[in-house]
């Protein structure tokens, strides 16, 4: 474990209030990225002619490169119901008034995706979409095809990020279209992203664009914002309870009282209770004692501390690279995704097909190198067996990060290099004996 990660781990365990921790972190981040603001745009090539020639060949071959595991679309019969796969769904793929104001007219996540460059030979960037192309989620047919593909390959639920800030929503147009059009027949749920909206979209953390108001009144009001959607016949339930996930549970003030209020109002309006998931994102892990029904792991954050870091063993082309590189293959083959403290507790596991946010953060990104569909399949098969044997879980649920987080290199959707291979691996993991 390197010193930076060790200090981060210690910081989040210090017994200070979440608000104070966030404030201290914000000050640190602002100073850190003020000093590094120019680093992201600096390209200082290594002095190795042979390596630069190999890099040039790698870049030129990327236009037509297809991996040996590449798969074309394949129709399947109904998938086995041996596990429920819930995939996170990002709606930042259509113009939005806020993004127009902050980044320029027409800016979407595709702007980040298309400008990514490999940081070393063998670094799989840019990740470019396959069949679905650089889609616009305002167009119904695009979402219809996403649903068709997801259901064909065994993805059971879309977990839409819900961005709500004291009455103001962002990235809402695609989700509104889905909610209003019942012909889009896909089970869904919400993950409330209850944190500040910052400049991370462009690869920096400093600068809050929309702040999260962490008042009791704001958190009480939130449940009234989403209750109207709970009666949708497509909304996902766990044991007859309405599923709702909270990304930053530690930011909820007087959490027991707020949760009790949410439950009361939901029962009055819908005739049934909530099933609340608390994400293990940045906080301590005892949320069932605070009123949540369960916790869930969060990839890639949940496994960073036990992963093998290989940053120093990779010859980066840009000497200014200031990110981190982890070994996905080592993590899967040695089952480092098993988080022992979560076993025996009501904590649902998570998985990521891959992870690489250099599209957003350039040479300060985090890369999980050596990710492949066959390794993802091995990991998923193991999780499916696990959730079906764990008596403490109410359902065999696995959270997948993600369906379409292209800017973070975490997606199941078809791309140019692998085609439908990750989706085929998903189907095989669920259906093979």
Predicted stretch roles:
Residues 1-50:
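Boundary detector for helix-to-coil junctions that initiate low-complexity/charged tails
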């Amino acid at each position: 474990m390197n010193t930076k990660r060790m200090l981060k781990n210690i910081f989040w365990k210090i017994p200070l209030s979440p608000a104070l921790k966030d404030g201290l972190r914000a000050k640190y981040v602002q100073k850190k990225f003020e000093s590094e603001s120019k680093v992201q745009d600096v390209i200082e090539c290594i002095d190795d002619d042979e390596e630069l020639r190999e890099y040039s060949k790698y870049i030129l071959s990327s236009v037509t490169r297809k991996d040996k595991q590449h798969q074309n679309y394949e129709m399947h019969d109904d998938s086995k119901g041996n596990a429920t796969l819930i995939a996170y769904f990002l709606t930042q793929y259509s113009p939005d008034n806020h993004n127009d104001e902050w980044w320029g007219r027409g800016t979407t996540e595709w702007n980040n995706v298309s400008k990514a460059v490999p940081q070393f030979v063998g670094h799989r960037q840019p990740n470019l979409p396959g069949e679905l192309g650089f889609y616009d989620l305002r167009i119904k047919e695009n979402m219809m095809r996403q649903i068709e593909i997801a259901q064909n390959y065994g993805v059971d639920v879309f977990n839409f990020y819900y961005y709500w800030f004291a009455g103001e929503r962002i990235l809402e147009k695609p989700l509104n279209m889905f909610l209003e059009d019942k012909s889009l027949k896909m089970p869904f749920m919400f993950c409330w992203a209850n944190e500040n909206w910052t400049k991370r979209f462009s690869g920096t953390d400093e600068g809050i664009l929309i702040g999260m108001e962490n008042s009791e009144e704001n958190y009480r009001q939130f449940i009234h914002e989403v209750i109207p959607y709970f009666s949708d016949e497509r909304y996902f339930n766990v044991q007859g309870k309405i599923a709702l996930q909270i990304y930053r549970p530690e930011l909820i003030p007087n959490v027991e009282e707020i949760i009790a209020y949410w439950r009361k109002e939901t029962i009055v309006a819908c005739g049934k209770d909530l099933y609340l998931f608390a994400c293990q994102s940045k906080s301590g892990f005892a949320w069932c004692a605070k009123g949540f029904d369960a916790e869930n792991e969060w990839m890639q954050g949940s496994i960073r501390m036990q992963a093998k870091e290989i940053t120093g063993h990779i010859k980066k082309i840009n000497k200014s690279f200031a990110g981190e590189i982890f070994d996905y293959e080592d993590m899967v083959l040695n089952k480092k995704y098993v988080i022992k403290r979560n076993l025996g507790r009501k904590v649902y596991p998570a998985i990521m097909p891959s992870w690489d946010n250099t599209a957003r953060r350039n040479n300060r990104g985090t890369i999980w190198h050596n990710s492949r569909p066959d390794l993802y399949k091995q990991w998923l098969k193991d999780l499916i067996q696990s959730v079906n044997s764990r008596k403490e879980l109410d359902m065999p649920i696995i959270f997948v990060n993600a369906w379409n987080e292209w800017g973070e290199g975490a997606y199941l959707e078809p791309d140019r290099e692998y085609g439908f291979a990750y989706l085929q691996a998903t189907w095989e993991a669920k259906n093979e004996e």
